[in-house]
Amino acid sequence: MAMNVESWKNEERQPFVGWDFSYLEGRMLEDLPPWSYPARAATLMRRASSVVDMGTGGGERLLELRVSWPPRVVVTEDYPPNVTLARERLAFLGVEVREVELTRHGPMPFADGAFDLVLNRHSGFNSEEVARTLAAGGIFLTQQVDGRWAQDLLALFGARPQWPDATLANSVVWLEAAGLAIVAAEDWSGRFAFTDVGAIVYYLRAIPWLVPRFSVDTHLAVLMELQARLERGEGLCFEARKFLIEAQKPER
């Protein structure tokens, strides 16, 4: 037991940078949805003259699509360490990095019709603001983690999803109410698994809102039960949910 606890505490101390889970490669295994958000985003960027990537993290995902960037690229991010990282990675490439508190769903610091493409991968958004900042005929593409993601995992730690209303159906209603036409809307559920308990520790520390105040010390009993489950050959497999929406602002 002592060896496991020390190993888990070591995972707890590992740094997490940007929105990069490569540290868990081979230890967190996730089913893939039937669509490819990067491929769709790249196609839309090649047709655009301007794009804003909402909630870019450290810019790691956007950099992977650099060959498809339009002439004007703007990103927003609200977590200060990620803002700094995004500026270090993107500003010298001509990308405008803006610190915007998307979690508050307030106004974005952009003019009406500023962009003909708005991208959003796993970040909050205000439907009215998306519609306002889109040019006529512009496209909004978003992939979201369903608010009920991993609720079976969270329940083990006595936690509940904080945004259970973040669903495809609700998002479609909000976007349509803002005046956007839904081009595509896809829902998906699958499974994701961890190969060891330490990977769960790292994951929950990296995303602190999943289990508030999580630590090895405060949740040791749950971690020990997960270790016992693994040793019984039951696996550490949980429910994954995502959805994708492409919406368009009407032409003038």
Question: Where are the regions a protein language model picked out?
Answer:
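Short, glycine-/aromatic-enriched active-site segment of Class I SAM-dependent methyltransferases
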Residues: 144-163
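N-terminal, positively charged/glycine-rich alpha-helical extensions of SAM-dependent methyltransferases
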Residues: 1-22, 31
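A short glycine-rich, Lys/Arg-flanked "PGG" loop and its adjoining helix->strand segment in the class I
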Residues: 125-141
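Conserved Class I S-adenosyl-L-methionine
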Residues: 181-252
